[in-house]
Amino acid sequence: MKKLTYLLFCLILGIGMATAQTTKVTGTVISADDNEPIIGASIVVKGTMVGTVTDFDGAFSLDVPSSAKTLVVSYVGMKTQEIEVKSNLRILMQTDNQSLDEVVVVAYGTAKKESFTGSAEIIKNEKIEKRTVANVSKALDGLVAGVQTTSGSGQPGSGSSVVIRGFGSIKASQNPLYVVDGIPYDGNINAINPNDIESMTVLKDASAGALYGSRGANGVVMITTKKGKDGALLVNLKANWGIASRAIPRYETMDERGYLETIFQSYKNDQIASNGLSPEAASVAALTAMGSGAKAIFGTNQMYNPFNFPIAELIDPVTGKVRSDATLRYHEDWMDEATANNPLRQEYVLNMSGSQNKTKYMFSLGYLNEDGLLKTTNFQRYTGRINVDTEYKNWLTAGLSTNFAHTKSNTSQTSTSASSNIFYSAQLMAPIFPVHQLDENGQIMYGADGAPMFDYGSTRPAGANANFNSIATLFDDKYGTNDDNVSGRTYISLGDLKDGPLQGLKLTANFGFDYVNRNNFTYYNPYFGNAASVKGMLAKSNYRYFSYTFNQLLTYDRKFNDKHHIDFLAGHEYYDYEVSSLSATKSGFPFGGIYELAGATTITDASSLKDSYTIESYLFRANYDYMDK
């Protein structure tokens, strides 16, 4: 009875401690100007990505870590506040007049924050540059309220899955539309150097991205690249060095002793349940059964027995534990063998900007080399950008923006719940199975080239991934992608006079293109693993994407008597997209290390594809506000 009472006490105490780890904070956010609730205000725990947004009544509820002391409350056009954590809050937000004078990049133009009625979030370059990310989409992590970002593969250079407007159908894409310098972007998002970005605006509601039609149904991310600044030539050189590590700790897994003791316990439980033996008799029977069935678990001649005693003598039947005088013949941790030791990340950026004779220019070069958490994985990127804007007359301006990027990635299998996924299989592999081939003394064996030989488990039990070694695929197989990305944007603008009868009237023509040349390859060695039965396999594919957009926009933006503001847009846009691909797969290599199709004997697959489509749009938008309301 005392033991039961003690256990109940511990259980209740544990529940109380778990509950105490977070504190529920509720409250309302109200405008100090009119005492009306603020809808969509962002409330974030300072220094974390834990946050929420207010509902239609300006109310919110948030589970805050008990260690947190401060909440950051923000909203477009309001001053950001830091509030002390309390269980019930009533937050008054003050108008930020300086912020209201800022402009928001919207579809086919800009708007003042004060008069903008849609839902948008602006991320300026100061926040972007504080994050050492390789992919633009990663810069959105935790910075935009209501936007869900998920990092899936963890491969170096990979981005985040961005969901702005929630999930639709199961099979439909949730990806937002990316717009770079006013033109929808079809290139690789990782081809854009985050250091070249001036700001990003996330258009979250349907009205804000309506002019893009169905392409903007999942939300729109407006990317504005850096432009030249007035003044003399300014040169900036930026260098970053760092190391990567796991964001979350590894799962706790069994060691060799714990694994064998668990096997013994399962045999013992079976003897009790199936044969009705007493615990003492079941222990003896279990040890005998383990010894007779050793080949099914430990392979031929108990080659996967990591201890220096045979299985029948390894477990103490009284305690169910591995005998204390047993020592390990070998020990190889699969996750340790797979992961790199402090993978290096290095980045260099050269930026030059200035102006001369009413012409502003910006030129940048960038290089990124990012090693992955898994050995042999890597991402490299070379980028170059030129932005030029010039004013020929007070009624005639033009500009050009070009970007080139070459990316190269060496990857691994990490995106499936299968044995080929290294993170998945390395943590599920029983600790008694070694990564490398071992001699009778438990020492690693080396091949003629001096490299350690991997154990593909040809005598490993079928339930333990026989004839496969996921870690060996990092070294013996190859997975890679090489991309060349070229993008261009150009415009010419007439009008936009500051006075006279045509004040506020402007005609702009924009042209932009995106070109991607992508080469993928997958190589399986001819000796072991996935393609050993066909003496190796090599698959290569080439994809070419080309799109261009040409639009003509007529805008009229004028304010009368400092009270009435009219913003009118009418336009036409033509969009054309083409994709072509060519792929082939061959098998039958005379030896390993051949990475060209000509070296193989048998064609197993060959295909090609070409597709295209066009979109023609007519645009219209009219806005009116009275005294910026």
Question: Which sequence ranges carry the predicted segments?
Answer:
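Short glycine/proline-enriched loop/turn "hinge" motifs that connect secondary-structure elements
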Residues: 352-357, 525, 589-592, 623
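Surface-exposed loop/interface segments of Gram-negative outer-membrane beta-barrel transport/assembly proteins
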Residues: 114, 230-330, 372-379, 383, ...
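Structural motif corresponding to the C-terminal cap of alpha-helices
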Residues: 367, 371, 494-498, 556-558, ...
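Outer-membrane beta-barrel channels and translocator barrels
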Residues: 133, 230, 345, 356-357, ...
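Short, small/polar-rich motifs associated with maturation and membrane association
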Residues: 1-385, 397-399, 403-405, 460, ...
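Conserved alpha/beta core surface patches that mediate binding of polyanionic ligands
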Residues: 344-348, 615-618, 628
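Residues on the lipid-exposed face of transmembrane beta-strands in outer-membrane beta-barrel proteins
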Residues: 225, 350-354, 384-390, 488-494, ...
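Exposed, low-structure sequence patches enriched in small/polar residues
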Residues: 571, 619-625, 629
